[in-house]
Regions:
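Intrinsically disordered, low-complexity non-transmembrane regions of multi-pass membrane transporters
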Residues: 1-18, 24, 186-215, 248-254
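N-terminal alpha-helical transmembrane segments of multi-pass membrane transport
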Residues: 1-71
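Interfacial helix-loop-helix linkers and transmembrane-helix boundary segments
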Residues: 38-47, 66, 78-79, 99-114, ...
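Hydrophobic transmembrane alpha-helices of secondary-active transporters
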Residues: 56, 82-106, 240-243, 261-276
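Alpha-helical membrane segments and immediately flanking helix-loop junctions
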Residues: 85, 93-99, 114-124, 128, ...
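Alpha-helical transmembrane segments
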Residues: 164-182
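Core mid-bundle transmembrane helix pairs that form the ion/substrate translocation pathway
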Residues: 177-181, 188-244
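Transmembrane helical segments that form the transport core of multi-pass membrane transport proteins
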Residues: 220-276
Length: 276
């Protein structure tokens, strides 16, 4: 009888006994994401940690549990706190800045308009969210998904106090970003002719080192003076770029664009996936 009781307790402690149909569906979704990331190589740096975080939390929900009394919270809960306080998105921007060459943008300022086109997606998502019954702040947080920008989506959701929506927004934004290689080609063919796709781009003018150094400094001053609340994201983006272009802090540039960037991607990806 003792052996049977022990076996019964063991069965009750397994994930199989405690999971709901919703958990099994999300486990299947996580496996699909892993397949797309590993087999199809669709944004594996994003999809692998997101999918694995999703897998873990749906088998063992306590891994995202908040601390209760003297009992510590789950591991991924502490990763997620870094999302809520906008620490990881800001560090991601610093890494992106350290990897980005703004030379083509400086040489051809008209290309700023390409980035402005993202606003159509943002406003479209905003009005769609309003029509679906979301409040103003919730719709504003959701709208950034339309710009396919994961770190900014997380940052704005936190700033607007929409922490209950932060997880779904982050998963939607990063899933959208990861699926761009699937979504983009058919849309490119739909919106352009074969002749337009064969247009040969002209060589842009050379950009001096002084221009590249001044660019992050000037952008930071102008943007933050106009919109002070953008300082965490714009400031970190331009700081990373200044590391790259100054040429005097090579170690910081390499760390921001490599080791630190990949550590942050792991923390951000697993915590975002676990928030589902």
């Amino acid at each position: 009888m003792n052996i049977l009781d022990t076996l019964g307790n063991l069965v009750h402690q397994t994930a199989f006994f405690n999971l709901t149909i919703g958990n099994y569906i999300m486990i299947a979704v996580a496996c699909v994401f892993l397949y797309l990331a590993i087999k199809k190589e669709y944004e594996p740096l994003l999809l692998v940690p997101i999918a694995f975080g999703m897998l873990l939390v749906n088998m063992y929900p306590a891994i995202m549990q908040e601390p209760v009394g003297d009992q510590a919270g789950g591991l991924l809960h502490y990763f997620y706190i870094l999302d809520e306080y906008s620490i990881l998105p800001s560090l991601i921007f610093m890494g992106v800045g350290a990897m980005t060459d703004f030379g083509p943008l400086i040489a051809n300022p008209k290309s700023f308009l390409l980035g402005a086109a993202a606003q159509f997606g943002i406003y479209g998502a905003y009005f769609l969210a309003i029509l679906m019954g979301f409040g103003g702040k919730a719709a504003a947080a959701i709208s950034i998904i339309g710009g396919a920008d994961g770190p900014t989506s997380i940052f704005l959701a936190g700033k607007l106090g929409q922490t209950d929506l932060l997880g779904p927004i982050a998963v939607a934004a990063y899933s959208y970003m990861s699926l761009v290689p699937i979504i983009q080609p058919p849309n490119m063919k739909l919106l352009t002719t074969k002749k337009e796709r064969k247009i040969k781009m002209e060589q842009l003018r050379p950009v001096s080192k002084l221009e590249k150094i001044l660019f992050p400094v000037i952008v930071t001053i102008v943007v933050v003076m106009i919109l002070p609340t953008t300082a965490p994201l714009v400031g970190m983006l331009m700081l990373g770029n200044l590391f790259r272009e100054s040429g005097v802090v090579k170690q910081l540039s390499e760390t921001a664009s490599n080791a630190l960037m990949y550590i942050v991607v792991i923390l951000l990806g697993t915590s975002v996936g676990a928030s589902t």
